């Protein structure tokens, strides 16, 4: 009897030690819509295991340089570079995330260097990065909760981000078919590994919407036009998102398309971008 109990305990330990971690990369870019403006690039590289995640994030913002001319108001280029740590609590009907992020906004975030390297390979209109605001500390705390309501395929997301650069509250929903344990990072506004708590082999499609109420947005302030006034951001911001994903034993892929409402009055069109997430289990 004691031997049987010991074998069961050893098997449980072996199973626990065999639990895989997850490495994922999420790349957002407006090239999916043939543009290079406003929120032009975002990259998150992260490693998650046992509900603890560590990551590196870079977001880059530029004016609509292709259509800009002197006298036209637009956002000045800038970037963020953040180290991120997150705690995930997951259950079949719940996903809660708390993120702590610390880094810089401005020249030290390497937005100019990153876009220059990319545009050596992919041509794009010239952006005058001397208009970038000076550097500042970028720190934030984000809390997001996602949970099912009424039906398995209906999920709500809500939470808030409090930071030195950007502060907002958000609430939204998504309708998802297939593997309903997945959630959209683009509607959660928090680190969201594209991992399933269901089957090792699964597919999923979703569509959803979210509303943000901005309390602070330092990413929109300086005007790209040196003679123009400072820009004022819009407080209510809506987002539409849709996507699909596949999950295999070794990892997975996810594709998303997003449309954001105008973030400032001089913006000439909604912001649209695509996102690709690549997951590797190891």
Map each language-model feature to its residues.
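Residues on the lipid-exposed face of transmembrane beta-strands in outer-membrane beta-barrel proteins
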Residues: 43-47, 83-89, 102, 141-147, ...
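Hydrophobic h-region of N-terminal signal peptides that target proteins for export
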Residues: 7-17
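Transmembrane beta-barrel domains of Gram-negative outer membranes and organellar outer membranes
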Residues: 21-140, 213-229
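Residues that define the transmembrane beta-barrel architecture of outer-membrane proteins
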Residues: 37-43, 77-81, 96, 133-141, ...
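Transmembrane beta-barrel strands of outer-membrane/channel proteins
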Residues: 23-29, 54-60, 100-106, 156-164, ...
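Outer membrane beta-barrel transmembrane domains
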Residues: 22-24, 28-33, 37, 64-69, ...
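Gram-negative outer-membrane beta-barrel domains
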Residues: 87-94, 99, 106-109, 126-154, ...
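Short loop/turn motifs that connect adjacent beta-strands in outer-membrane beta-barrel proteins
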Residues: 17-20, 49-53, 90-98, 148-156, ...
